[in-house]
Amino acid sequence: MKNPNHKNQVRIIGGEHRSRLINFNNADGLRPTADMVREKLFNWLGQDLTGTTVLDLFSGSGIMSFEAASRNAKMIVAIENNIKTAEKIKQNKKLLNINNLHIHHTDAFSFLRNTPDTFDIIFIDPPYEWQEWHALWQYLPNVLKENAQVYIERKEKIQLPPYLTERKNGKCGISHFVLAEYQKNTETP
């Protein structure tokens, strides 16, 4: 049974909004990336994301988007297909007065097929039961800038497509995570 005193909150760990709490709703498969994993990731990426464009697929709580905004990313796009979860991200955006975060209530594939934008950094952290990796790998190159950094988190060990080169990896609890770099000259679908 769920603890009635438990609050669905997660803390921003770095940058301008460091220590601010954001609330998130209950949704199937929603599990914010752990603090220690985010700390490691942003040590890998750097604490200052000034000038970068960021895509947060499967945004969930929005914590990865808020971490990027807190570190001065130029533009952040959050994709979330659960309407209540997307609305909660919008509420937190307003609360934190973040103007460069754009939230889209849509599925990842619709966004990837239709956006003209490309990104420097992409966060991919779908629910554990999600298994559409092959299709994702087909659409992903369309939105990647040369040398884009792609963070992937999932329950199983991660098999990267040929166009992504693993740079760093780790494990926390049952989550495996990888930071990879896009190489345009390698084989793409």
Language-model segments: residues:
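Class I S-adenosyl-L-methionine-dependent methyltransferase catalytic core
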Residues: 1-189
